[in-house]
């Protein structure tokens, strides 16, 4: 069992938890994720690692309640436990694999949307600790949904906060802020965008026009974390990739976002059905088609 050491509500329906998971904390690197499961009846929930403390043996996760499984997580309190806390999974951020001196020569910008701020934070923190400067553009729909602003301010070289409704910081979206900086003569050599699919799509559209290489962290539904079920497959550069083993980071200019968003919408619908089952006291496992593992490609039958 993996006990919850700390729980904090960051914003409406957004929570932070520190979980005691010594092995995961010892091996974790920025960009990786874990898959958690509350109990035997719980679904497997993929969550990017927000932070980790090797000495304390804790891993920090941030999640938003968007369906049945995350709604159950929100009811957990300090002292409660997860049955499974599997990780670290996925490949670490490409940036931490690069030569530090070469990184210092680059002008790097992170663009975080909503809960996407959580997986951006450990990367920016790691770069800061290694003497690498980077700017961060982080935003949300409104001021009350902003998270980790002060934490990010401590590690970012320049922090630009945006809100869609203008209640805090720059009035507009992250792409608007990037365009304004570009118009003022600010140039970037590398961009990392993490957030909702639609946000990453339009960031990549802009950065492609501006000629800025861009990495995105894909977060479609992941189930087994090994690539066996096929739930997290996407098209990248015309090839099938699996977010849980090949990613979660990919070249944003090569990702087929339209196909990825179509798949994500399908799972949101099924998650909604799962919410109804939970509220009615019913659980449903196996043979439901949620993971995509039973999908087959067949040739037309001969006539």
Where are these regions (language model features)?
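Short, Lys/Arg- and Gly-enriched loop/turn segments at beta-strand edges
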Residues: 42-49, 89-97, 244
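Short, surface-exposed secondary-structure boundary micro-motifs
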Residues: 39, 87-88, 237
């Amino acid at each position: 069992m993996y006990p919850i050491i700390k729980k904090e509500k960051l914003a409406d329906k957004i929570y932070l938890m520190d979980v005691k998971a010594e092995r995961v904390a010892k091996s974790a690197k920025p960009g990786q994720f874990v898959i958690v499961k509350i109990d035997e009846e719980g679904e497997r929930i993929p969550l990017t690692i927000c932070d980790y403390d090797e000495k304390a043996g804790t891993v920090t996760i941030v999640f938003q309640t968007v369906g049945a499984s995350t709604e159950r997580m929100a009811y957990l309190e300090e002292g409660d436990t997860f049955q499974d806390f599997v990780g670290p999974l996925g490949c670490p951020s490409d940036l931490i694999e690069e030569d530090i001196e070469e990184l210092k020569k680059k002008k790097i910008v992170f663009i975080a949307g909503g809960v996407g701020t959580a997986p951006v934070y450990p990367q920016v923190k790691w770069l800061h600790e290694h003497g690498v400067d980077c700017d961060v553009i982080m935003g949300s729909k409104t001021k009350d949904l902003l998270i980790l602003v002060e934490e990010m301010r401590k590690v970012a070289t320049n922090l630009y906060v945006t809100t869609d409704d203008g209640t805090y910081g720059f009035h507009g979206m992250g792409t608007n802020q990037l365009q304004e900086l570009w118009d003022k003569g600010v140039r970037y050599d590398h961009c990392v965008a993490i957030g909702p699919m639609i946000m990453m799509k339009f960031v990549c559209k802009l950065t492609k026009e501006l000629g800025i290489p861009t990495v995105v962290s894909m977060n479609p539904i992941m189930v087994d974390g090994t690539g066996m079920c096929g739930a997290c497959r996407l098209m990248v550069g015309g090839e099938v990739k699996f977010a849980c083993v090949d990613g979660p980071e990919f070249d944003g200019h090569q990702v087929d976002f339209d196909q990825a968003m179509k798949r994500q919408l399908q799972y949101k619908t099924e998650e909604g059905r799962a919410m109804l089952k939970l509220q009615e006291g019913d659980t449903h496992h196996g043979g439901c088609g949620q993971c995509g593992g039973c999908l087959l490609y067949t040739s037309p039958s001969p006539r």
